[in-house]
Amino acid sequence: MNIIEAAVATPDARVAITIARFNNFINDSLLDGAIDALKRIGQVKDENITVVWVPGAYELPLAAGALAKTGKYDAVIALGTVIRGGTAHFEYVAGGASNGLAHVAQEAEIPVAFGVLTTESIEQAIERAGTKAGNKGAEAALTALEMINVLKAIKA
């Protein structure tokens, strides 16, 4: 039996982060967590990290796809926050972002890490952006790095 596992340290990784401006008071913390994890744990060099801001979570798949198609990046990290309101808007935005990002990963064959919070309240979002429930931006960054190494091991 063969088992493939990989570490997260990826010093030569080239990583793009696409991040939504909408709810930026939460997303800024996700970005800080992602960049900290990339540099501190993944040992990624500052010059190998690109950050692209988009209006909202719904635009993340388009930006992620454009970044992936350049061939310049080993992974893309998508960060954003969608908070449920009183209308069906939440389902459309959260579903569109999730499905779109999964499609980009499958088409581009590079990791596209999902760091989009989909919460019932602002309080839940704040908890997941660096307080009680950790930082989902950092978790997405570590997922991206591990998947870079997993794919390398599969192809080796």
From Swiss-Prot:
GO cellular component terms, alphabetically, are: cytosol; riboflavin synthase complex
Positions in coiled-coil regions? none
Record's keyword annotation contains Glycoprotein: no
Question: What keyword terms does UniProt attach to this protein?
Answer: Riboflavin biosynthesis, Transferase
Please tell me where 5-amino-6-(D-ribitylamino)uracil binds in this chain. Answer: 22, 57-59, 81-83, 114
Pathway named in the protein's UniProt entry: Cofactor biosynthesis; riboflavin biosynthesis; riboflavin from 2-hydroxy-3-oxobutyl phosphate and 5-amino-6-(D-ribitylamino)uracil: step 1/2
- Give the annotated active site: 89 (proton donor)
User: Which SUPFAM superfamilies does the entry link to?
Assistant: Lumazine synthase
Q: Which GO terms describe its molecular function?
A: 6,7-dimethyl-8-ribityllumazine synthase activity
Q: Which domain of life is it from?
A: Bacteria
User: What Enzyme Commission number(s) appear in the record?
Assistant: 2.5.1.78
Q: Name one Pfam family in it.
A: DMRL_synthase
Q: Which residues bind (2S)-2-hydroxy-3-oxobutyl phosphate?
A: 86-87, 128
Reactions this protein catalyses: (2S)-2-hydroxy-3-oxobutyl phosphate + 5-amino-6-(D-ribitylamino)uracil = 6,7-dimethyl-8-(1-D-ribityl)lumazine + phosphate + 2 H2O + H(+)
Q: Which terms does the UniProt entry file under GO BP?
A: riboflavin biosynthetic process
Keyword Ribosomal protein attributed: no
> Any idea what job this protein has?
Catalyzes the formation of 6,7-dimethyl-8-ribityllumazine by condensation of 5-amino-6-(D-ribitylamino)uracil with 3,4-dihydroxy-2-butanone 4-phosphate. This is the penultimate step in the biosynthesis of riboflavin.
Q: Provide the family line.
A: Belongs to the DMRL synthase family.
Assembly description: Forms an icosahedral capsid composed of 60 subunits, arranged as a dodecamer of pentamers.
Protein name, UniProt field: 6,7-dimethyl-8-ribityllumazine synthase
| Species, as recorded | Enterobacter sp. (strain 638)
Higher taxonomy: Bacteria, Pseudomonadati, Pseudomonadota, Gammaproteobacteria, Enterobacterales
